[in-house]
């Protein structure tokens, strides 16, 4: 939980925030960093592919660097179904994964790399691809890793047209 997204959102006045991590240690670290602001966040320690989320409870789902660790099709399917259930129709989904030129391993684990079409293909027609963006992420070790971010709007179970701007 080195990401400071939750800090930035809290300082920006956002509320009704949830943070999920599989690691209690990471959650505790982030809570300590936030101090009294941590009480304004729902903290969830769980495997995202197994967690139960309330139906249509979220306006925005942001995943930076989890999805690419899901190397089994069954894990990816479980993840997508949870997102589709948890995010309200018309809600936004932002997924950040390693891009096609990103590393093949991270922290000793195999990862799945994506381009925008293959990542959107994992999510399917319910997720309308609005935009995509590649980024070179500077690691703490002084190297760079290619990331791909896809921005989607979720529709109903009925098919949504696929569209995107190119970058």
Describe each PLM feature range.
Residues 65-69:
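Short catalytic micro-motifs in class I SAM-dependent methyltransferases
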Residues 62:
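A conserved beta-strand element that flanks and buttresses the S-adenosyl-L-methionine
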Residues 59:
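Conserved acidic residues
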Residues 1-56, 70-167:
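Class I (Rossmann-like) S-adenosyl-L-methionine-dependent methyltransferase catalytic domain
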């Amino acid at each position: 939980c080195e990401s400071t997204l939750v800090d930035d959102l809290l300082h920006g006045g956002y509320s009704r925030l949830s943070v999920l991590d599989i690691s209690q240690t990471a959650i505790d670290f982030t809570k300590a960093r936030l101090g009294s602001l941590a009480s304004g966040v729902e903290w969830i320690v769980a495997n995202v592919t197994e967690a139960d989320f309330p139906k249509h409870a979220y306006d925005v789902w942001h995943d930076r660097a989890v999805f690419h660790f899901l190397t089994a099709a069954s894990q990816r399917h479980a993840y997508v179904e949870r997102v589709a259930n948890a995010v309200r129709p018309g809600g936004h989904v932002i997924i950040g994964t390693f891009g096609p030129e990103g590393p093949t391993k991270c922290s000793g684990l195999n990862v799945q790399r994506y381009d925008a079409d293959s990542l959107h293909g994992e999510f399917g027609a319910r997720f309308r691809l609005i935009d995509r963006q590649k980024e070179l992420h500077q690691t703490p070790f002084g190297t760079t890793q290619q990331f791909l971010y896809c921005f989607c709007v979720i529709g109903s179970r009925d098919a949504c047209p696929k569209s995107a701007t190119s970058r």
